[in-house]
């Protein structure tokens, strides 16, 4: 796996699924391929994206700044600086300075990532802030190692939280989660349908699923009533894909 592929993988792992994630993936690909060369326009686009947390925007801004060539005097962006200040916690800043001193002696991506993984996400963000604000300088490879370690820390905590939700025994949460997943699958079917001949059938199935979810939410139902809803919808989606000759196992 190339360095930039690894960076893209880690950064995308902390972004919630949806159309915005696909858009960000495309921007990262363009930036890494040297196609998107206007940093000002890119940062303005990033600043106005909805849904993303300030820290995620800060990390993306840091990656764009590292990758896109820019003029020396280009102003640093406030939204990135604020996101990478470690919540203003002096403890994070102290740790960030110690980490920075270690990273300065490091020259490889993997070495930097290993060192960084023993620090908290707050300290890692503060260290990125030091580099972003030009208070310290490290090689691009080392900076990317720091980025990937930060994303790994964040993704780990997101995964723990997600696992807790998936394994929860609370029937109300499980019920709502099934309905949300059914809605998301319906949306995916509508997007895949496009203008094909079978599109009408796919749209019909998706529409029925949405109406069912809406009705269940409106009138309130027993928590077990949604158990088969997502599975039925996935079966319909896979049958539709087979007829279309499309294999998209990732919807499982």
UniProtKB/Swiss-Prot annotation:
It comes from the Viruses. One of its GO terms (cellular component) is host cell nucleus. Keywords: Host nucleus, Membrane, RNA-binding, Viral matrix protein, Virion. Residues 1-164 are annotated as: Membrane-binding. Residues 165-252 are annotated as: RNP-binding. It is a peripheral membrane protein. SMART domains: Flu_M1_C. Gene3D superfamilies: 1.10.10.180, 1.20.91.10. GO terms for molecular function: RNA binding; structural constituent of virion. The keyword ATP-binding does not apply. It is found in: Virion membrane; Host nucleus. A motif (Nuclear localization signal) lies at residues 101-105. GO terms for biological process: viral budding from plasma membrane. Belongs to the influenza viruses Matrix protein M1 family. Homodimer and homomultimer. Interacts with NEP. Binds ribonucleocapsid by both interacting with genomic RNA and NP protein. May interact with HA and NA. Cannot bind NP without genomic RNA. Plays critical roles in virus replication, from virus entry and uncoating to assembly and budding of the virus particle. M1 binding to ribonucleocapsids (RNPs) in nucleus seems to inhibit viral transcription. Interaction of viral NEP with M1-RNP is thought to promote nuclear export of the complex, which is targeted to the virion assembly site at the apical plasma membrane in polarized epithelial cells. Interactions with NA and HA may bring M1, a non-raft-associated protein, into lipid rafts. Forms a continuous shell on the inner side of the lipid bilayer in virion, where it binds the RNP. Determines the virion's shape: spherical or filamentous. Clinical isolates of influenza are characterized by the presence of significant proportion of filamentous virions, whereas after multiple passage on eggs or cell culture, virions have only spherical morphology. Filamentous virions are thought to be important to infect neighboring cells, and spherical virions more suited to spread through aerosol between hosts organisms. Most abundant protein in virion. When expressed alone can form virus-like particles in transfected cells. This is Matrix protein 1. It comes from Influenza A virus (strain A/Puerto Rico/8/1934 H1N1).
